[in-house]
Amino acid sequence: MLKSRLLLSFLFLFTYSTVFSQNLVVQKPESNVPAPVSAAFAKKFPTSEPVWFSDYQGKYNQQLVYEGRFMYKNRNSSVIYEANGNLLAIVARVDQKELPKKILAYMNEKFSSFPIRDAALVTAQNNETTYEVGIIINETYVIKVFSEEGDFIKSIIG
């Protein structure tokens, strides 16, 4: 009787820990990428091999998109596609030293006590290029968006 209780409690704990640990995984690589997405990526970046993730975006998280993360010209980069292969954006990490002087001056003037955590060059599907600079203010990640010329556009709480 004691052995069966011990066995049952062990099985319960094992099952519970397995189920619980699966909920801790935030994002798993996507293996079922639609053919139009793979084809569009291969055409644009023929020598790169991405790791794919799927996510829902949009105002009410209603748009399924596919993000491919890869190295391009020695930069961590990613692309975001709709399921039909339509390119939404290309994002490339940039070093703080590569940001336009106007952006650095703005950040030093307005947010000198908040160090830049990361920066990216974003090209949207309409070929509009922006810089996104991430900082942490009061434990909240804030993205400052700038034009290609370095003019401040908006802040995004992310």
Where are these regions (language model features)?
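Interaction-mediating elements
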Residues: N23-G158
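Bacterial Sec-dependent N-terminal signal peptides
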Residues: M1-Q27, F41
